[in-house]
Curated annotation (Swiss-Prot):
Organism whose genome encodes this protein: Nitratidesulfovibrio vulgaris (strain DSM 19637 / Miyazaki F) (Desulfovibrio vulgaris)
Name recorded for this polypeptide: NAD kinase
Residues in coiled coil: none
Catalytic activity: NAD(+) + ATP = ADP + NADP(+) + H(+)
Main location: cytoplasm
Signal sequence extent: none
Subcellular location field: Cytoplasm
Function recorded in the entry: Involved in the regulation of the intracellular balance of NAD and NADP, and is a key enzyme in the biosynthesis of NADP. Catalyzes specifically the phosphorylation on 2'-hydroxyl of the adenosine moiety of NAD to yield NADP.
Cofactor(s) it depends on: a divalent metal cation
């Protein structure tokens, strides 16, 4: 879908002078063309970011994939589309190269913003019948062992159907956006970002008793921690963690509203896979 540009929020990587300077140049460039823009630093404060984004029609995020992920997670359900400007290394989530930002913004102004809705995840941790922790994820929700090199025991259920027990280093529940992250390193599948599905991939499963699964977006996954001797943690997008206890049940499902990404279609998904080394042409 397309949306008209009214005002723009520019979010810069925390403590990054290059990002701050570029943000100010962008603000001045947009102001010269009649658009209001505000520059804020990504401090990790979800409330202040949500307030800043209330009046904007687009959020430009200046940084690497980590910065883009953090901002995207805090904008879940806000209805504000996000466009990443790559100042990092991999830059798979970024649509715009920092060296070509002016031409990219010119395309935005001339054609409006094309918005793509992507599936995101919500989760909650149930302990003794009560919810003790909850949140959202743009890339993945991971349940993994602590510092000791021991497998952990998890019990998996999809809806009312029990899949069985998994003994592994952990489990990755990934969105299509996160399929090129931790999930693919654990032999999870590449998934087109426009598909409304999510994947379940074990990390080093003992005896390989569970292969990666692709679940419909409407499916609800429940993971019960059976381990009583090892440390077990839940992490969201590799950035925020929570210690789990034996008997905890982690419920994962599709987040309402999903995540909105703006696109200017400079590079197709398949060309991006090739450019980042996920597909290698042998010809």
């Amino acid at each position: 879908m397309h949306t008209a540009l009214r005002s723009i929020l520019i979010v810069t990587k925390s403590g990054h002078r290059e990002a701050e300077a570029l943000g100010e140049r962008m603000r001045a460039w947009l102001a010269a063309r009649g658009l209001s823009a505000r520059v804020v630093e990504n401090t990790g404060d979800a409330v202040s970011l949500a307030v800043a984004g209330q009046e904007c029609s687009l959020a430009l995020v200046l940084g690497g994939d980590g910065t883009i992920l953090g901002v995207a997670r805090r904008l879940l359900g806000s209805g504000v589309p996000l466009l990443g400007v790559n100042l990092g290394k991999v830059g798979f989530l970024a649509e715009v190269a920092a060296t070509r930002w002016e031409s990219s913004l010119e395309r935005l102004l001339s054609g409006g913003v094309t918005v793509q809705e992507r599936l995101a995840l919500s989760f909650r941790v149930e302990r003794d019948g009560a919810t003790v922790h909850s949140g959202g994820a743009v890339n993945d929700v991971v349940i993994n062992r602590g510092i000791l090199a021991r497998v952990i025991n998890l019990d998996l259920r999809v809806g009312s159907e029990r899949l069985g027990e998994l003994r592994a280093d952990g489990l990755i529940v990934s969105t299509p956006t996160g399929a090129t992250g931790y999930s693919v390193s654990a032999r999870g599948p590449l998934v087109h970002p426009q598909l409304h599905v999510y994947t379940v991939t074990p990390i080093c499963p003992f005896l390989n008793n569970l292969l990666p699964l692709v679940l419909p977006g409407e499916a609800r996954l429940s993971v019960t921690v059976r381990d009583r001797t090892n440390e077990v943690y839940l992490t969201q997008d590799g950035q925020e963690g929570y210690a789990l206890q034996a008997g905890d049940v982690v419920h994962v499902e599709r987040a309402p509203g999903g995540m909105l990404f703006a696109t200017i279609e400079e590079l197709s998904y398949y060309r991006k896979l090739k450019a980042k080394g996920f597909i290698k042409d042998q010809a």
